[in-house]
């Protein structure tokens, strides 16, 4: 149990640490507001048997998103920027619908992870990909929330841009294993 809100990155790292402690073979994350379809979890489980990391993507062939207007523009721009600057062949870096093998959790445990907010999603992909683990994206259906408000603070875009700049510099200085 967490006593206060520390951000999605912090929450996922706590879950990862618990999964490592219990020696789980697979750790799956998805949005609790049903933006992600739980019925798609079997697709992740099937793929994680052959890969170390499986990321859902609403932007690859077969994926969908009902984002419209400004939010769609910002999301697509962020993901295109990540792909271009980090030189990682993914279509999406920002979704939390993912499956991690125990091996990928161990890589992240050893990495220096600083992001507590939404930029942690980019950071996780970066460290897993750069470690040389087998990664794949699969299409997902994304449904924007119908009730409640987004929990993304306004400063998150700024922090995300700083994180992307930091990872870009790391990418220039580091070779993929």
Residue ranges of model-derived segments:
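DNA-recognition element of transcription regulators
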Residues: 122
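Acceptor/aglycone-binding surface of glycosyltransferases and processive sugar-polymer synthases
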Residues: 3-21, 38-118, 145-162
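Short beta-strand-to-loop acidic/aromatic patch adjacent to the donor-nucleotide binding site
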Residues: 24-33
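Catalytic donor-sugar/metal-binding loop of nucleotide-sugar-dependent glycosyltransferases
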Residues: 89, 113-116, 125-143
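Residue-level signature of catalytic and energy-coupling elements of molecular machines
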Residues: 15, 33, 101, 128, ...
């Amino acid at each position: 149990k967490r006593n206060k809100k520390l951000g999605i990155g912090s929450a996922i790292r706590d879950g990862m640490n618990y999964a490592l402690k219990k020696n789980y073979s697979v750790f799956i994350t998805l949005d609790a507001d049903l933006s992600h379809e739980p019925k798609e979890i079997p697709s992740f489980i099937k793929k994680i048997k052959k890969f170390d990391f499986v990321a859902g993507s609403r932007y690859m062939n077969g994926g969908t998103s009902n984002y419209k207007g400004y939010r769609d523009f910002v999301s697509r721009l962020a993901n295109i920027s990540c792909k271009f600057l980090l030189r990682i062949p993914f279509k999406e870096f920002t979704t939390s619908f993912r499956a991690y093998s125990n091996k990928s959790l161990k890589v992240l445990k050893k990495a220096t992870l600083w992001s507590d907010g939404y930029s942690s999603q980019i950071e996780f992909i970066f460290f897993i990909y750069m470690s040389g683990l087998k990664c794949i994206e699969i299409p997902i259906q994304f449904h924007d929330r119908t009730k409640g408000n987004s929990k993304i603070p306004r400063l998150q875009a700024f922090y995300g841009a700083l994180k992307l700049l930091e990872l870009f510099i790391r990418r220039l200085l580091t070779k993929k294993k």
